[in-house]
Amino acid sequence: MKICAITGSTGILGKRVLETLPFKFSKFRGNIANFKEVKHWIFKNEFDLLIHLAAKVPTKQVQSNFKKALKINHIGTKNIVEALKLKKNKPEWVFFASTSHVYKLNHKKVKTSEKEKLNPLSKYGFTKKKAENEIMRLKNMKIKYCIGRIFSF
């Protein structure tokens, strides 16, 4: 059975992943913005896959506390990538939950292509775009990854 490391397992999406996917899970339960905590969890556990769902999501909360959102969404993701860089036994695959907010979309224009240039209109989209840039660094480590841009209007 595959072992899957997961962040954000207490959120709406995380709970569904735990209920649905047939893996043994290693859940991160700490401060994603704290590199030492992230590194300890990554080094303490052996896993085949990593699903990164932890995020500060409600756009109103991101607007009201941008600094905290940036720490969770961007720095938290950077911490995962940096810890994986140091880990000898790397996962086969990483999934990162991003958002449609990385595109320049509005309620009138909801049709887009994944090839469209990233141009976030919101602070939330900005934090997730920065996080996506961190995830793309996994390619240099020969780790396969998928960035899932979840649409919600």
Task: Locate each region found by the language model.
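Active-site segment of SDR-like NAD(P)-dependent oxidoreductases
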Residues: 10, 57-60, 99-104, 118, ...
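Rossmann-fold cofactor-recognition segment
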Residues: 26-36
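Rossmann-fold NAD(P)-dependent oxidoreductase module
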Residues: 16, 20, 83, 134
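N-terminal Rossmann NAD(P)H-binding glycine-rich loop of SDR-like oxidoreductase domains
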Residues: 2-22
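A short helix->loop->beta-strand "cap" motif at the edges of active sites that frequently abuts
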Residues: 87-93
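SDR active-site strand-loop-helix element
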Residues: 7, 50-54, 94-100, 148-150
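NAD(P)H-binding glycine-rich loop region in Rossmannoid oxidoreductase-like domains
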Residues: 36-72
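Catalytic helix-loop patch of NAD(P)-dependent Rossmann-fold dehydrogenases
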Residues: 64-67, 71-78, 102, 106-147
